[in-house]
UniProtKB/Swiss-Prot annotation:
Pfam families: E6. Keywords: Activator, DNA-binding, Early protein, Host cytoplasm, Host nucleus, Host-virus interaction, Inhibition of host innate immune response by virus, Metal-binding, Modulation of host cell apoptosis by virus, Transcription, Transcription regulation, Viral immunoevasion, Zinc, Zinc-finger. It comes from Human papillomavirus type 94. InterPro entries: E6, E6_sf. Transmembrane segments: none annotated. This is Protein E6. Belongs to the papillomaviridae E6 protein family. One of its GO terms (molecular function) is zinc ion binding. One of its GO terms (biological process) is symbiont-mediated suppression of host innate immune response. The gene is E6. Plays a major role in the induction and maintenance of cellular transformation. E6 associates with host UBE3A/E6-AP ubiquitin-protein ligase and modulates its activity. Sequesters tumor suppressor TP53 in the host cytoplasm and modulates its activity by interacting with host EP300 that results in the reduction of TP53 acetylation and activation. In turn, apoptosis induced by DNA damage is inhibited. E6 also protects host keratinocytes from apoptosis by mediating the degradation of host BAK1. May also inhibit host immune response.
């Protein structure tokens, strides 16, 4: 499936360039080599993640490995945290114009999720040189209270 010098960066371009439908696409995880399920392929595409090419073969990432990589990266490469105002001061631009991903699931944050960080005074984290926050799904998942 090697595409040469013009290797597609995402699943949709890969399907188009190879002339296959999304439903027929089969990718393995770059970390564990397990074949991705349809749900994992869909999540990978919706999170706007890039394919990894090794020896001319494209790879994605399964849900389990994405979660584990997010945790490992946060623990190993966390640099510092700022409130939104601090991030905007450091970068000299609004967070609404910046690409900020969820540190757990890697989905790009939309305006409402960025606004929530500002309004609820939640910090953004500099991890591996990139600003990361928490998407609405992971925010809810991380703040659910277990009844006693």
């Amino acid at each position: 499936m090697s595409m040469g010098a013009q290797e597609p960066r995402n699943i949709f371009l890969l399907c188009r360039n190879c002339g296959i439908s999304f439903e027929d696409l089969r990718l393995c995880c770059v970390f564990c080599t397990k074949q991705l399920t349809v749900a994992e392929l869909t999540a990978f595409a919706l999170r706007e993640l890039n394919l990894v090419w090794k020896a001319g073969v494209p790879y994605g990432a399964c849900a389990r490995c994405l979660l584990l990589q997010g945790i490992a990266r946060r623990l190993k490469y966390w640099q510092y945290s700022y409130y939104v105002e601090g991030v905007e001061e450091e970068t000299k631009e609004s967070i609404n114009t910046q690409q900020i991903r969820c540190y757990t699931c890697h989905k790009p944050l939309v305006k409402e999720e960025k606004d929530r960080h500002r309004n609820e005074r939640r910090r953004l984290h500099k991890i591996s040189g990139y600003w990361r926050g928490c998407c609405a799904y992971c925010w809810t998942r991380c703040t659910v209270r277990i009844p006693q």
